[in-house]
Structure formats: structure tokens, C-alpha cells
């Protein structure tokens, strides 16, 4: 049985644990492919070494007083933990470094939609029946698992792939706690798919 941390309350989240990270834990990436995205903390590049992966590097100064190495390690550990708990994730493979920046090598999801762009109405889900059904079904499955395991996922966000499958991306932590806040985050995305399906049915 995979253990879920229960010693950190989500409301008191202070960032990654203080566990030290050995420098040789980070694999050197000699060169980067095309930049394919950017978030609040990381820049994302296509991997030249493995076209199935992308390299996500923390920008300097984006992790506050917490070393970026610890953030990267915690993201890798949490992603693996969620995967072992049966959640769909953008899989993380290794700790990486490039020219002084550190981060994580992850699956490259082609033509992905960011859930934050969807819920903030910056982008829309496609008006496609199967696509929206997949989003709805995946959201329902994630909600069921959150309830069954009684866990909260810190900084829960998703990528939606080109088929409408929903994948947890960039998680900060998973703790034994009320799942209500996490379920609310899932429902934000779910409501967009549901509205699309209602519109399709009315046409």
C-alpha cells in the first residue's frame, strides 16, 4: 500500500521538504530543443535526447527561499506518488540540469490544453462530442479517487491531451486531508466540458 503524507495540512503548505538533494541526482542535459511553453516558475523545452519528453526548468528566483533543486525533487516524488495511487499524471522521469538551471524531464503532451487557460476563459475546449465526453469521464474518475482515498493535491492543475484525456501536471504535494478543495478544482474544468456537451445536445 502506498503511503500518503499526513503530517502537512494544505492550509499550512510551506513548499518542498528540506530533504537534501545530492548534486549528482541531476542528469546534465547538453542542449535543449524548441521552447514549447512557460509557467509561473518554469520554462518548458522539447527534449533533443528523447522526442517523447520535454525538459521543464525552473527560472532563477521563482522558488523564493526554497532551492529549486528541492522543488524539482518534490515534484518528481509527488508525481510518482500520484501515479502509484492510480491518478492520471503527466509522468515525470528524471531530475535534470542545464547551464545552471534545474528541473524535471517529463512526458511531452502534444497539443495540450492547460486547465488554467480553460477555467480562466483564455482558451476553450473543442466543440467535439468524444473529446468533451473524455474530459467529463476523466474528471469524474479523478473525483471518485480523491473521495475514496481522502486526499488533497496541493496546487492541482491539469493538461488535457488531444483526445480529451485529463492529466495532473506539476503537483506540489499530496496529503491525507479533506478532498473538497481538490474536487472543486476538478469541477472547474468539468463544468466546461459539461456545458459543451449540453450545447452539442441542444444543436
Swiss-Prot record:
An example molecular function term from Gene Ontology annotations: kinase activity
Top-rank EC class of the record's enzyme: transferase
Active site: 155
E.C. number(s) listed in UniProt: 2.7.1.-
GO annotations of cellular component type: extracellular region; host cell
Main localization of the protein described in the UniProt heading: secreted
Start and end residues of each stretch annotated as Disordered: 1-23
Keyword Transferase attributed: yes
Keywords: ATP-binding, Kinase, Nucleotide-binding, Secreted, Transferase, Virulence
Binding-site residues, ATP: 40-42, 107, 109, 114, 157
Reaction catalysis annotation: L-seryl-[protein] + ATP = O-phospho-L-seryl-[protein] + ADP + H(+)
Subcellular location per the Swiss-Prot or TrEMBL entry: Secreted; Host cell
Homology family: Belongs to the HopBF1 family.
Note: HopBF1 is specific for eukaryotic HSP90, despite the fact that the target Ser is strictly conserved in prokaryotic homologs. This mechanism appears to have evolved to prevent phosphorylation and inactivation of the pathogen's own HSP90.
Domain writeup: Adopts a minimal and atypical protein kinase fold.
Function: Effector protein that targets and inactivates the eukaryotic molecular chaperone HSP90 during infection. HopBF1 is recognized by HSP90 as a host client. As a result, HopBF1 phosphorylates HSP90, leading to the inactivation of the HSP90 ATPase activity and chaperone function.
Name by which UniProt lists this protein: Type III effector protein HopBF1
Organism (species): Ewingella americana (strain ATCC 33852 / DSM 4580 / CCUG 14506 / JCM 5911 / LMG 7869 / NCTC 12157 / CDC 1468-78)
Lineage, opening ranks: Bacteria, Pseudomonadati, Pseudomonadota, Gammaproteobacteria, Enterobacterales
Gene: hopBF1
